[in-house]
Amino acid sequence: MGTSFVGYLTFVLLLLALTKVRGGPAYNSPLSSDLSDLKGLLERLEDRLPVEEVETPVQDIFAPNYDSADSSNSAPSLTVEAARPGADMMYNRGSWTQQEKSSPLRNKLRELLNAPRSMRRSSDCFGSRIDRIGAQSGMGCGRRF
C-alpha cells in the first residue's frame, strides 16, 4: 500500500509539473502581443512620414568624452565610421544590403522601440518614491555626476 501511494503521488506531481511547463510559450504572452502592436504602429507611422534627405551625425554614447584641458591623457579622436567599419551595412534576410537612409525621427522611434525596459522608464533608479526620498536626503540615485 505504501509503494502504490508513493507511485500515485509521484505520478500526480509529474502531471502537475508537465501542465506548468506546457502553460504557454513565451511568444503568446500579452507583452509579446503589445510589442507586435507597437511594431505595427511604428511601421504605419514610418509609411506616413515624409522621407528626409538630411542626415544628422550619429553620436556614440559609449565613446569617452575627452577634455581639451587634459591633453596629456587624450587619445586620438576617431570618427564613428572608423570605430564601426560595418555600420552602414545591415544583415537582412540572408544577404548584406545597404541600410536605407532614414530620417532622424524614424531613428529615434526605432531606438525607443528597441531600448531595454530599464532605459524607457522615467525613473532614474529604483522608482519614483525612492527617488523622491533620495532627492530630499541628497543620497539618491537621481544625482548625475
From Swiss-Prot:
Propeptide feature: residues? 24-117
A Pfam family reported for this protein in Swiss-Prot or TrEMBL: ANP
Q: Which UniProt keywords apply?
A: Cleavage on pair of basic residues, Disulfide bond, Hormone, Secreted, Signal, Vasoactive
Q: Where is the signal peptide?
A: 1-23
Tell me which domain of life the UniProt entry assigns to the organism this sequence originates from: Eukaryota
Q: Where is this chain's protein located in or outside the cell?
A: Secreted
GO MF, one example: hormone receptor binding
Site feature (Cleavage) residues: 117-118
The biological process GO terms on file are: blood vessel diameter maintenance; cGMP biosynthetic process; cGMP-mediated signaling; negative regulation of systemic arterial blood pressure; neuropeptide signaling pathway; receptor guanylyl cyclase signaling pathway
| Membership in a protein family | Belongs to the natriuretic peptide family.
Designated name of the protein: Natriuretic peptides A
